[in-house]
Amino acid sequence: MVKIGFDPAKNATNRASRGLPFELVEQLDWAHALMEEDTRKAYGERRFQVLGFIGGRLHALVFTPREGKVHVISLRKANSREVKRYAETPKSRTD
């Protein structure tokens, strides 16, 4: 299981606005996720964008590795453009 961390205030905001608590990231299917480093800006630390399933729904996660954990910055349901990109991107699958 992946260890996660997050800012409690940001988690509360995400839960209220999107109905998604950051704790759900523990259920993300990392084996089939699409992950890319976000190099658009100088964030001061490495930042990654992930498209992966939680339950039967594709989600978009932004995180930074911090203190040996996945530090969650953002979690939301993937939009239609992201669903299409996920479907069209070859992934290394184990099944």
Residue ranges of predicted features:
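Ribonuclease/tRNase effector modules and their secretory precursors
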Residues: 1-95
